[in-house]
Curated annotation (Swiss-Prot):
This is Uncharacterized protein YMR124W. Transmembrane segments: none annotated. GO terms for cellular component: cellular bud neck; cytoplasm. Residues 41-58, 318-358, 397-409, 434-470, 622-639 have a biased composition (Polar residues). The keyword Ubl conjugation does not apply. The lineage of its organism: Eukaryota, Fungi, Dikarya, Ascomycota, Saccharomycotina. Residues 367-381, 417-433 have a biased composition (Low complexity). Present with 166 molecules/cell in log phase SD medium.
Length: 943
């Protein structure tokens, strides 16, 4: 900068004055400039008539100012002149001007201008005028340099100077400021805390209380707060709006579109943004109109800049029927090739004529114009007119009615394609919804009634011009040979055929869906009929069966959780706390054989000591009946075929309880061969000596005492009554095997039938783990009901009769049923263990007795032996009575569970009603009576 000033000083020959001025500027902020000595600039002056001062110093200072500004990457600025006299109340503004001057003319050796680096000393009130007069300086240019800091925040520059109009402008320069995003015009909220009291009083405590409200931030926008950003954007928008208004007012630039409901007097739209037109040779004489404002505008017509002499020619009026009120305001003709302007929108209140551009298709190519369009263009040359106003227009002039060159004539009405027509609601400009093709189906007679160019009294009537209602809308107010046609759209023949094809496909699809629905209904009916027939056949086949109210006995329920397909299978219990292995070769079993008790203790993480007595079941036919040596041998039979075997549990039965259960082995085998529909395994307990220590029943030490605690609390009198009413056990092998195997095949000789008729799915359903979700519905398969009872009521649902209907119950109910089943399993297990212990005890006593008879030297006294034997007999009687009571308790509890399940099935619609059940019971009782009578008759004949 110093080198440049030195060079300039040498060239002009005024080095001392420039150096002095430069030093004054650097030392005293604005030097000795006094704005009172400035020469006023003419208001109407421009670059050519600026008053030149006699002295050449201001020109040099102007060059120096431009040099300073260009050194800081800013354009040279020329500000208009400020007033000559500065009153005392403007001291604060002058002080801020000096501060901003310090910002922009600080150390010239710095690349960037630091912010707020100067101390602002505020002079006292008595020295205000001296300070003001001392800080005035002569002008650098013909415009006042202090006028550059005229505005409050000094962020703008005169736009008139930017345009090159010189320093002369009007006095309304406050509105002609645009933003200058330079690096030197930063004043943010962060500057307030260090702005007001450097070297002086704190802000608000001194004589100057001028508010400092920073509203502009021109850089570092990433660190703005939301308040700063909003103020910045608001001020920027206001400044831009004022600049645009000034430009429009002065007429220097083209007008921009105002907002709707505007009361301004300048037009809407940019003349440069107009719709495209076809080739100019087809449009030698086109009608044009100026751009109009938007809806609800109160403008008074087209602007003056569009009313040029070559556009003021009016076309002749007598070329087309000369109807009254027609062509009263004929638009001026634009030169060939000039693009037409836009049309106003709906509900316009303007009173000037509106005309649409007369191009056949604005969005069509130049090479795609047909013969019909060329003929229409020829007609336009002779009969030019507009397309008409938009709908619901309130213009105050007569609107031309009649001829629309773009509506097809009578011969070409059917040949109008979808690409050719232009409705009245569409216009030629992209800004006013050009390229929009209205839907033909929505353009009914009522749709075109408000949008037609005719009056309400001149509504077009229907004619016999075709089948479509759109073809009938012809204006009949004019002669037939020259009648005006509406701009009616209709689909082309290919598109009509396409629509018909789509309708036909939809009809075929609907028809196919209806046929498919009918077919599904027929299949459901057939399936329901088959289910009904199968249920009837099954009911007939099971007429001899009684209600399945026979409770599951101990061994059957205990073995329900065993899988006997392989010897290495592990028991699957429903409860994890009672999980234990039941075979001797299970990997989860600790193989420590106790020869005294014959039990294996399992390794588990629970506090309950679980024991198991395991027995390897021999296959059928491998058992031995050793009756010669007097040992009690019974049959252990397990049938692994679940489709051809019967599954029954073994619960000790006192011989005096039910004499009908003493059945021979031959009867047992015959019933096994007859039972093909049930999965009942006849398992007998082996009393062989080598299998005494290996039993097949799960045994809980802690639970055994709990189940029998009620018996231990019985009074002595009740015990004596039990003993007196109980006979000793029968140790006969054949009778014991019969007593421990109650058979449930539904024969009339038994009193109660077995409640178990499981298939493989039922067994898997009974082995489900405990569910922790009590809210979701879960499928339930009945445990005690027969398949025939389930499917008879659910046959109407369309399911297969071979599978029972699956019902869904809540998780809470399912868990309750599962716990009831587990409770029955535990009770039957305990009762079976007790029965087996009594049986083993009886067997040991018989063996001891046989040994004593064979031994010549008894080891105890006869009297003591007799008393001991009597005690043992009484103990056996007591034990047998306990077992009998436990069995009765289990039976009653199981009956309750069966009744609850029947009620649950009935509530879910899978069981017949109670009336049906009562009727079935009566029929079965009658059938039993008839068979009993037949048996009596046959016995009488045999005798």
């Amino acid at each position: 900068m110093d080198a440049g000033l030195s060079t300039m000083a040498t060239r002009n020959g005024q080095s001392s004055a420039r150096v002095k001025l430069r030093n004054n500027l650097l030392n005293n902020d604005i030097g000795n400039i006094d704005i009172r000595d400035e020469t006023p600039i003419s208001r109407n002056g421009n670059d050519s008539n600026i008053n030149i001062q006699p002295s050449s110093v201001p020109q040099q200072q102007q060059q120096q100012q431009q040099y300073y500004r260009n050194g800081m990457n800013e354009a040279p600025i020329q500000a208009p002149l400020q007033q000559r006299q500065i009153p005392m109340q403007n001291y604060s503004q002058q002080q801020r001007q000096q501060q901003q001057y310090n910002f922009e003319y600080s150390n010239p050796h710095m690349n960037e201008i630091p912010l707020m680096q100067h101390n602002f000393t505020k002079p006292s009130l008595s020295n205000n005028r001296d300070n003001v007069n001392g800080k005035k300086a002569s002008s650098f240019t013909q415009s006042s340099f202090s006028n550059f800091f005229k505005h409050k925040h000094q962020f703008g520059k005169s736009k008139k100077n930017t345009k090159g109009t010189g320093g002369g402008g009007d006095g309304d320069d406050d509105d002609e400021v645009i933003l200058d995003d330079s690096a030197n015009s930063d004043l943010t909220f962060n500057d307030i805390q260090t702005f007001g009291h450097k070297g002086g009083d704190k802000y608000g405590y001194g004589g100057d209380s001028t508010p400092i409200i920073p509203t502009l931030v021109t850089k570092d926008r990433g660190n703005m707060s939301n308040t700063e950003y909003r103020k910045y954007i608001t001020n920027q928008r206001k400044t831009a709006m004022n600049a645009m208004a000034k430009q429009t007012k002065n007429g220097t630039l083209a007008s921009l579109p105002p907002r709707a409901m505007s009361l301004q007097s300048f037009p809407n739209g940019n003349p440069l943004m107009q719709a495209p037109t076809p080739h100019p040779r087809f449009q030698p004489n086109k009608m044009v109109s100026a751009n109009y404002s938007r809806s609800n505008s109160l403008m008074s017509g087209p602007p003056g800049q569009f009313r040029q002499p070559q556009q003021q020619r009016m076309l002749p009026m007598n070329n087309y029927n000369n109807h009254p009120g027609q062509f009263q305001n004929t638009p001026p003709v634009m030169p060939s090739g000039q693009q037409p302007p836009q049309q106003p929108r709906t509900l316009s209140l303007t009173n000037g004529p509106r005309y649409s551009p007369q191009n056949p298709r604005p969005f069509a190519g130049h090479q795609q114009i047909s013969q019909r369009q060329q003929q229409q263009q020829q007609q336009l040359q002779l009969h030019p007119m507009s397309e008409g106003y938009r709908t619901m227009s309130l213009q105050s002039q007569n609107v031309p009615q009649g001829f629309n060159p773009w509506s097809p004539n009578d011969n070409d009405r059917k040949a109008v394609s979808m690409k050719q027509p232009i409705s009245q609601s569409s216009i030629s400009s992209k800004n006013n919804s050009a390229y929009s093709i209205p839907n033909v189906q929505n353009n009914s007679l009522t749709t075109f009634s408000p949008s037609s160019p005719t009056d309400a009294t001149a509504m077009p009537n229907s004619t016999k011009q075709g089948s479509s209602p759109l073809k009938k809308q012809v204006n009949i107010d004019q002669p037939i040979e020259n009648k005006g046609k509406l701009n009616v759209l209709q689909l082309s023949t290919p598109q009509q055929n396409e629509l018909k094809e789509k309708e036909r496909k939809l009809a075929e699809m609907e028809k196919s869906l209806r046929e498919r629905e009918a077919l599904v209904e027929e299949k459901e009916k057939e399936r329901a009929e088959k289910n009904t027939e199968a249920n009837e056949e099954e009911e007939i086949s099971h007429e001899s069966d009684d209600l399945n109210l026979r409770p599951a006995s101990a061994l059957e329920t205990g073995l329900k959780d065993l899988k006997l397909e392989s010897e290495s299978a592990v028991a699957n219990r429903a409860s994890l706390s009672t999980f234990s292995s039941t075979f001797s070769d299970s990997p989860s079993k600790q193989r420590i054989i106790n020869t005294r008790t014959g039990m294996y203790k399992l390794e588990n993480s629970t506090d309950i000591n679980e024991y198991v007595t395991a027995q390897e079941f021999p296959s059928p036919g491998k058992y031995n009946s050793n009756s010669d040596n007097g040992e009690m041998n019974t049959t252990n039979e397990v049938d692994f075929d679940f489709n051809t075997s019967k599954r029954a549990s073994l619960l000790q039965s006192i011989p005096e309880r039910d004499p009908k259960r003493n059945v021979s082995d031959a009867t047992i085998k015959r019933r096994e061969s007859d039972g093909n529909g049930r999965r009942l395994s006849n398992v007998n307990i082996s009393m062989n000596q080598e299998n005494i220590n290996n039993d097949t029943f799960l045994y809980k030490k802690n639970n055994r005492d709990g189940h029998l605690s009620a018996v231990s609390h019985m009074s002595s009198s009740s015990r004596r009554s039990f003993i007196s009413n109980t006979l000793p056990l029968n140790i006969d092998s054949a009778s014991e095997s019969d007593n421990f195997v109650p058979h449930m095949d539904g024969s009339p000789s038994k009193t109660k039938s077995a409640p178990v008729s499981y298939d493989k799915d039922g067994m898997n359903a009974s082995e489900e783990d405990f569910s922790f979700d009590n809210t979701l519905a879960k499928p339930y398969e009945p445990l005690y009901a027969r398949r025939g009872d389930i499917t008879s009521a659910g046959s109407t649902s369309g399911e297969d009769s071979s599978q029972p209907k699956m019902i869904t119950i809540s998780g809470e109910q399912l868990n309750l049923i599962t716990e009831n089943k587990e409770l029955m399993n535990e009770l039957t297990l305990v009762s079976t263990e007790l029965a087996e212990s009594i049986k083993r005890e009886t067997e040991l006593e018989e063996r001891i007795r046989l040994y004593e008879t064979n031994n010549s030297a008894p080891s105890f006294d006869d009297s003591s032996s007799v008393s001991f034997s009597d005690f043992e007999k009484e103990l056996r009687k007591k034990s047998s009575k306990i077992v009998q009571l436990i069995q009765q308790l289990n039976d009653e509890r199981l009956k309750r569970f069966i009744a609850e399940e029947q009620l649950l099935l009935q509530e879910n619609g899978t069981k017949p009603s109670s009336m049906e059940l009562v009727g079935r019971i009566e029929n079965l009782n009658k059938l039993i009576d008839e068979r009993d009578s037949e048996i009596e008759m046959l016995k009488g004949r045999l005798q």
